[in-house]
Amino acid sequence: MIGIDTCFLIDLYWQDSPRNKNARALFSKIVNDDSVQLAIYFNCFNEFLHVITDPKRFENAFSIAEAIDVIDFWCDLDRVKVLYPDDTSFKRTLAWMNMYKLGRNRVNDTQMASCYLSNNITSIITANPKDFEIFHSFELQDYRKKK
């Protein structure tokens, strides 16, 4: 099972993103490989909703309804599992925040990584590998790089 970072969802749907083409190519590859199962940390959807509907960031920002339709689409896919934190992942998040001296801007990514690890997810699709490298727990699939 492969975890998805929020940036992948945003780049997949934001057509003007410089990473859109690579995100779409990777998505097509995933869709065509029935053996690939995906995991999405629940808060990725909250972040997606927050970012993709922001008219200050996007000239053609999604409406709330459009963003929710995208989220519903992902939640309904058979090969996608939405993950939620548990006590272990929450405590690991706090431990990692202390251990790696991470600041407040790293809370969401740290909690996502911890939840993925608790669910035996060892690979993450991201355009921000530096957010996860510090944990030494994941194979990072950086879709910015053409393969």
Kindly give the residue locations of the regions a language model identified:
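Aromatic- and histidine-enriched alpha-helix N-cap/loop-to-helix transition segments
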Residues: 40-46
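Acidic, PIN/NYN-like endoribonuclease modules and their adjacent C-terminal/linker elements
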Residues: 1, 110-147
